[in-house]
Amino acid sequence: MDLKKLLICTLFISINLFSNEHVKEEILKILVYNTHGLPEIFIDDDPKMRFPIIGRKTGEYDISLIQEDYAHHEEFSSNFIKESKFFRGPMGGTLLCPFCTGSGLTSIFNLPQEWKIEVDNEAYQTCSGWLRGANDCFAYKGFQIIKITTSKNKNFFVVNTHMDAGRRDSDRASRKIQLEHIVSKVNKKRINDALIIAGDLNLNSKDAEDMKLLEKFKNDLGLTDIFKDIKIDEKWSILDYILIRQGKEINLSVVSAGEDESFVTEESPLSDHPALFLELLIKE
């Protein structure tokens, strides 16, 4: 009888060990940050001081999803760690608008060397405001759809975006169309894998109409708002979001999330937005 129990126990342990060999876990630390990167003439701080610090701090993260990397990219990228891979979004200066800037999107990766990264840049087809409504039409805002393939040949997707600002009805109408653009693109690509969508959506958490847009967007793509019940310092307006969806092959579990309060100098924060972070346990 004892021998029979021993054999059953040994078999059970062996099965579990065999199963665990096929489950790989990885913790990813993700930064989402609008860097306030307008040209110096439009801001009242010192971007030449701020951006090298922000660039260095991206080395603390596996994935950094950056918005407003407009006028200070040279200072910003000068302090990336040597192994970082980075991809900028759609650039400006076209024949139709030679003085327009690019999307300001930059995604930075410090992932395992054997992982693959593919980036698809897309510009929004609408904007609101040339001389009013936050002047969004002077930037080719858009989004990046990033396909990440792990060493086990399993995929998950990340979207980095910066949407139309401003509080007018026309600004909100543009945001609605931009959200629909993301939904359409995700569906067109038939993305059924795990999905992370993050960035400056310019959807104010205290604006009921903006929140209706966010809820519809979440429902359309089956997303969960990671920061819904996480308190951020009251000095910030909540415009930035991290939304996730589980996949069939990869499971995303939240380890921790919040504001990285180290993004400051002795005088002030490094931007006019909070630095949001998310630690994810990825099981494949």
Question: What do these predicted ranges mean?
Answer:
Residues 42-46, 133-134, 169-174:
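Short, solvent-exposed loop/turn segments at secondary-structure boundaries
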Residues 59, 77-85, 113, 184-191, ...:
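Sec-exported extracytoplasmic/periplasmic mature domains
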Residues 63-157, 161-163, 254-260:
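Structured beta-strand-rich core segments of catalytic domains in phosphoester-bond hydrolases
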Residues 142-159, 171-212:
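His/acidic metal-ligating clusters that form di-metal
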